[in-house]
A protein has these predicted regions:
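Immediate flanking context of iron-sulfur cluster ligation sites
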Residues: 1-38, 45-53
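Generic detection of intrinsically disordered/low-complexity segments and helix-coil linkers/edges
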Residues: 13, 42, 48-51, 77, ...
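Polybasic, low-complexity binding patches
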Residues: 22-25, 45-83
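Exposed alpha-helical structural elements
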Residues: 29, 64-67, 105-108
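Short C-terminal domain-edge/linker segments immediately following a structured domain
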Residues: 42, 66-68, 88-90
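Short flanking/linker segments adjacent to small metal-binding domains or redox-active Cys/His motifs
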Residues: 73-125
């Protein structure tokens, strides 16, 4: 049975195969879709409740979930929602940090390229 929240997921608008890459990188664009999704917390919660072994759920790959599921299972039921909500927030922060690092790298490359072009101009004059 598909939960009602699943219909509101961003993942419904893209190829389902993207969520089941064998070795996804945290730099993979699908993680960004997850952390911006309106049902990220519900998705992440279900993946922990069901101990999903495959795929990206709520912005987290299977290998990451695998090591956290035992911690989740040890939590009392009344603490699990808060734990999942905090985990989702950390994933959103991680995504923002990854994007900031990519932007900083891009800006450094642009600056180096400009400096190289200037050097080429002054050297050929």
């Amino acid at each position: 049975m598909i939960p009602e929240w699943h219909e509101r997921g961003t993942c419904r608008q893209v190829d389902p195969e993207l969520w089941f890459e064998a070795y996804p990188s945290k730099y993979d664009p699908v993680f960004r879709l997850c952390v911006e999704c309106p049902v990220q917390v519900e998705c992440l919660r279900q993946s922990f409740d069901d101990a999903e072994e495959f795929g990206i759920w709520g912005g987290m790959g299977a290998h990451e979930r695998e090591r956290l599921i035992p911690k989740f299972r040890k939590k009392p039921y009344y603490e699990r929602d808060t734990w999942i909500t905090n985990l989702a927030a950390r994933l959103r922060n991680r995504d923002a940090e990854v994007r900031a690092r990519k932007e900083a790298t891009y800006q450094r490359q642009l600056a180096a390229n400009r400096a190289w072009k200037e050097e080429q101009k002054s050297g050929s004059a």
